Regions:
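Histidine/lysine/aspartate-rich catalytic loop segments that bind and position anionic ligands
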Residues: 40-84, 95
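Alpha-helix-loop-beta-strand connector modules within alpha/beta enzyme cores
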Residues: 20, 27-44, 80-111, 144-159
């Protein structure tokens, strides 16, 4: 609905990220076109099997997480004990190895996590509170990107080239 409303107002929409239970990625692709970026959350108990078997023909990347418990991802899932399911760096590395599309990680990601996260083989990260709750949000964003660039061993060049400049 938001995409259609934005497009009706003449606003350029470069992409969308959807959850597994949101609007189907095929519908997103139909409305946004082949040049758009479409991401899909990969948050299941059987994440490894899901990533190996899901149809990725309509998506550009998987969003994986959370790395840490965070208020911005209250619906990310809980285990049988009611504890929020988070992903370890080891799990994230395995996901990056088996995924047929680029992987980005989010959910509680902080600057201190970036060096280790960059070494997992994922293609990027996404944050909310690390920037929005910072005393200087612009500097926080700059620090995150600089640190990533310093430590990253893998990067999705095609996705970066499509990235919208802020």
């Amino acid at each position: 609905d938001v995409i259609l409303a934005a497009k009706q107002q003449g606003i350029k929409v470069d992409g969308i990220h959807v959850g597994q239970d949101d609007i189907p990625v095929e519908v997103c692709r139909e409305y946004l076109g082949e040049d758009s970026i479409i991401g899909l959350s990969a948050r299941t108990h059987d994440i490894f099997e899901y990533i190996k078997t899901v149809d990725v023909s309509q998506i550009d990347y998987f969003g994986v997480g959370p790395l840490h418990e965070t208020m911005t991802k209250p619906d990310c899932g809980v285990d049988l004990d009611g504890k929020v399911i988070t992903r370890s760096f080891e799990e994230i590395s395995k996901i990056a190895q088996i995924s047929p599309v680029p992987v980005v990680v989010g959910g509680g990601v902080k600057l201190i996590d970036i060096p280790q996260l960059a070494q997992t083989g994922v293609d990027g990260f996404f944050v909310v509170s690390s920037v929005s709750e910072a005393d200087d949000p612009k500097q926080a964003a700059v620090d995150l990107v600089k640190t990533w660039k310093l430590y990253a061993t893998v990067g999705c060049k095609d996705l970066i080239e499509k990235q919208v400049k802020l």
